[in-house]
Amino acid sequence: MRVPIRALEGRWPGLLQQRAGRFFWPDPRTILDPGADPEKFRTAMSALEVGGTYKITGSNRHPGADRLVAENLDLTGAVIVDMGASDGSTALDFLAGLNGFGSYVLADLYLFVRHSRHRGRSYFFDQDGQWILVVGSRTLAWPATSKLVRGLFGRGARAAAAKLDARDVLLLNPRMRRLMERDPRVTAVVHDIFAPWPGPAPDLIKVANLLRRLYFSDTQILAALDTLLAALPDGGHLLVADNSRIPGMPPRAGLYRRTGGAFEAVATTENPPEIADLVARAGSGRAWTG
């Protein structure tokens, strides 16, 4: 659990920051600048907690997964859906190795946060209107786990939420935004992985670091896998990847083909993904009722 109040980097004496660096945090307001440095944007975005998880991402996180696709699939003209794409950093790595794909959709339930200012402080809210972060001139704080934070800044958060000039902030990395501007094949959509896919049938669905036992029960993960199975045509593929917390464990991935009403393993990295056993059980008819 994070310390609920942190100091902002660069706003305190340098010696203090050197001695207590772990209590300092980069300014999350960097995400308000669509032209921000991509790496600084990624770091700033990691301060946001939405849906019970922090928006932590980075580049070159799934080299094994990308290699499985390159070695086993021809994606010429393919419709690709990247579920839980976060800010699109890993999608940029994936797209760099693709030629001639048909379309690429970044799908994430939390593509936006809402931002508003009140009395010199920035308040951030998730898509459901829940207050998730406050940033002042020298500190930032998370209200979800702290009654103190809610008591100190709750009134300001309510006032900020009611302001007419509050605006939505797109949580896509500046590099991804520039790519989307010049390549109409790449788009983004708000989507819940537990809901039926509303777009054209994908040839490949990628799910990375989303369907984890860290976040969901096995029953919930199976329900999501059944939904993904239903979205794919026969012969379509599912790519699952995760970055394990096990010390020394490299990124894991598995590529699976829909064959009839189930997934068939095509290839995996040396260590299969965490939910490989659940992928094998998808299509069993079990459902999560919420």
Language model features: what each stretch is:
Residues 194-205:
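A short acidic, Gly/Pro-enriched loop at the edge of an enzyme's catalytic core
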Residues 2-13, 19-35, 99-183, 194, ...:
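Class I S-adenosyl-L-methionine-dependent methyltransferase module
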Residues 20-76, 113-121:
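Class I SAM-dependent methyltransferase Rossmann-like catalytic core
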Residues 87-100:
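Conserved SAM-binding loop of SAM-dependent methyltransferases across substrates and taxa
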Residues 77-87:
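Conserved class I S-adenosyl-L-methionine
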Residues 203-218:
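A short SAM/SAH-binding and catalytic strip from SAM-dependent methyltransferases
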Residues 235-242:
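Conserved beta-strand signature within the Rossmann-like core of class I S-adenosyl-L-methionine
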Residues 220-234:
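A short glycine-rich, Lys/Arg-flanked "PGG" loop and its adjoining helix->strand segment in the class I
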